[in-house]
Regions:
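Short gly/ser-rich loop at a beta-strand->alpha-helix junction or flexible surface loop bordering the NTP-binding
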Residues: 1-157
Length: 157
C-alpha cells in the first residue's frame, strides 16, 4: 500500500489525448499495447505539469523509438489547469462517455482509445486530414514518419 506522504501517492492520473495519444498508440509495439479500462470518464483532477512530464518520461523509457511532440495533450474533467504552455496543453471533458474510451499504460497513466482519439482529432483537422487519419487507423495504410515510406495494408490500431 502506498502511504499518502510518498511521491507516488501525490501524483495525479495523467490521461494523454488528441495528438499525443495518436503518437503513443502508433508507436507502441503489440507487446506493449495498453489495456482497456472500465472507467467512463476522465480523471477528476488535472495533473500538474510535473506529473505530465514524468508520465511522458516513463512512456519514452518503455518505447525509446517514440518521439512525443510538444505540447503534450492531456485531458481531465477538471478546469484547474485550463491553459496551454510550451510543455502541456490541457483539455477538459467532464461528461461521461460510453464504451472503452480510456486505456491504461500503467502507473497512473492513461491514453484515449483509438476511436475516442479520432473523435477528438476531428475538431482540429481538415476533412482531408481526417479521412487520411481514418484510413490509417483502420489499417488501410500508415503514413511514413521522418523519411520513412508510406506503408499500405498496415495493421489497424
Amino acid at each position: 500500500m502506498v502511504r499518502p506522504s510518498s511521491p507516488v501517492a501525490s501524483r495525479r492520473i495523467v490521461c494523454f489525448s488528441h495528438k499525443t495519444a495518436l503518437e503513443i498508440l502508433t508507436a507502441l509495439p503489440p507487446s506493449q499495447k495498453p489495456q482497456p479500462m472500465r472507467s467512463r470518464k476522465f480523471p477528476d483532477q488535472a495533473p500538474s505539469l510535473k506529473d505530465a512530464q514524468l508520465a511522458s518520461d516513463r512512456i519514452l523509457e518503455q518505447c525509446p523509438a517514440l518521439s512525443l511532440s510538444r505540447p503534450l495533450h492531456v485531458t481531465s474533467a477538471s478546469t484547474s489547469h485550463n491553459h496551454r504552455t510550451d510543455v502541456v496543453e490541457f483539455h477538459r471533458s467532464g461528461k461521461p462517455f460510453g464504451g472503452t474510451g480510456l486505456l491504461s499504460l500503467g502507473e497512473g497513466t492513461r491514453v484515449t482509445s483509438v476511436p475516442f482519439t479520432f473523435v477528438q482529432m476531428a475538431t482540429s483537422l481538415s476533412l482531408i486530414e481526417l479521412l487520411e487519419l481514418g484510413y490509417e487507423l483502420c489499417g488501410t495504410y500508415r503514413r511514413g514518419k521522418a523519411g520513412e515510406p508510406t506503408r499500405y495494408h498496415a495493421d489497424p490500431l
